[in-house]
Amino acid sequence: MPQLDTSTWLTTILSMFLALFIIFQLKISKYDFYHNPELTAKMLKHNTPWETKWTKIYLPLLLPL
């Protein structure tokens, strides 16, 4: 029974990783990202009732049996 020749596997795997890296870089480079999103998007502060009150959070494990 002949043995499996694995001498070219390293070259194949490395070239596959290089090709995938290049493909993903090309895909990502097509997106248009904003340079400074803080200047364009202004957050509006909404006052909600639970922000002004003290609330207690009960965890399920702390409830009495």
Curated annotation (Swiss-Prot):
GO terms for molecular function: proton transmembrane transporter activity. Component of the ATP synthase complex composed at least of ATP5F1A/subunit alpha, ATP5F1B/subunit beta, ATP5MC1/subunit c (homooctomer), MT-ATP6/subunit a, MT-ATP8/subunit 8, ATP5ME/subunit e, ATP5MF/subunit f, ATP5MG/subunit g, ATP5MK/subunit k, ATP5MJ/subunit j, ATP5F1C/subunit gamma, ATP5F1D/subunit delta, ATP5F1E/subunit epsilon, ATP5PF/subunit F6, ATP5PB/subunit b, ATP5PD/subunit d, ATP5PO/subunit OSCP. Belongs to the ATPase protein 8 family. The modification N6-acetyllysine is found at K53, K56. GO terms for cellular component: mitochondrial membrane; proton-transporting ATP synthase complex. InterPro entries: ATP8_mammal, ATP8_metazoa. Keywords: Acetylation, ATP synthesis, CF(0), Hydrogen ion transport, Ion transport, Membrane, Mitochondrion, Transmembrane, Transmembrane helix, Transport. Pfam families: ATP-synt_8. This is ATP synthase F(0) complex subunit 8. The modification N6-succinyllysine is found at K53. Its main location: mitochondrion. Subunit 8, of the mitochondrial membrane ATP synthase complex (F(1)F(0) ATP synthase or Complex V) that produces ATP from ADP in the presence of a proton gradient across the membrane which is generated by electron transport complexes of the respiratory chain. ATP synthase complex consist of a soluble F(1) head domain - the catalytic core - and a membrane F(1) domain - the membrane proton channel. These two domains are linked by a central stalk rotating inside the F(1) region and a stationary peripheral stalk. It comes from the Eukaryota. It is found in: Mitochondrion membrane. PANTHER family: ATP SYNTHASE PROTEIN 8 (PTHR13722:SF0). The chain crosses the membrane at residues 8-24.
